[in-house]
């Protein structure tokens, strides 16, 4: 039992890694998504709130897979170079290629029409590019808060 608890709270714990990634995604996507939907896409506050509420459980399900996907993209990018530009570009590519299809499905589910979906997803892509690797930095910050090991080598325990 003691070993199980120690491994659960280890910096290499899958549970700790998943919780950190989930926290980061729910917070970031709620704030940024609502701003884009209301101020750029022209969605009503009610539509955006519905979208964000639907997105929370979706983000909880996809957060850790996204974190693993991002880590894989970052490892591939590290083969190209170690500089900040390569890292930022890899973060943007990982975020856009993983999140855009999920975001479009959420908007469709909450009743946004096709032009709103196209505008919101396109705007999200542009904003993601303009903000650089903001989510990647936020994710890394949350992982540090949760004391998850950098580059997240995940153990087989808990």
Swiss-Prot record:
Q: List the disulfide bonds.
A: none
Entry's localization field: Cell inner membrane
Supply the InterPro entries for this chain: Ala_export_AlaE
Which keywords label this protein? Answer: Amino-acid transport, Cell inner membrane, Cell membrane, Membrane, Transmembrane, Transmembrane helix, Transport
The membrane spanning regions, by residue number, are 23-43, 53-73, 92-112, 117-137
What is an example of a Pfam family matching this protein?
AlaE
Q: How does it sit in the membrane?
A: Multi-pass membrane protein
Cellular component (GO) terms are: plasma membrane
Please give one Gene Ontology molecular function term for this protein.
Answer: L-amino acid efflux transmembrane transporter activity
* One of the GO biological process terms: amino acid export across plasma membrane
Q: Which family does it belong to?
A: Belongs to the AlaE exporter family.
What's its job?
Exports L-alanine.
**Name this polypeptide is given:** L-alanine exporter AlaE
What organism does this protein naturally occur in?
A: Cronobacter sakazakii (strain ATCC BAA-894) (Enterobacter sakazakii)
The protein's gene is named alaE
């Amino acid at each position: 039992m003691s070993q199980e608890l120690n491994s659960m709270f280890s910096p290499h714990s899958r549970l700790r890694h998943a919780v950190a990634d989930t926290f980061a995604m729910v917070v970031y996507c709620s704030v940024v998504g609502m701003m884009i939907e209301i101020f750029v896409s022209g969605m009503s506050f009610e539509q955006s709130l519905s979208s964000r509420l639907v997105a929370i459980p979706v983000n909880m399900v996809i957060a850790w897979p996204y974190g693993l996907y991002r880590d894989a993209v970052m490892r591939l990018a590290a083969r190209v170079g170690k500089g900040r530009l390569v890292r930022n570009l890899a973060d943007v590519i990982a975020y856009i290629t993983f999140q855009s299809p999920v975001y479009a499905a959420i908007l469709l589910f909450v009743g946004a029409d096709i032009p709103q979906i196209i505008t919101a997803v396109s705007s999200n892509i542009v904003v993601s590019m303009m903000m650089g690797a903001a989510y990647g930095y936020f994710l890394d910050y949350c992982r540090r808060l949760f004391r998850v090991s950098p580059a997240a080598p995940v153990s087989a325990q808990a």
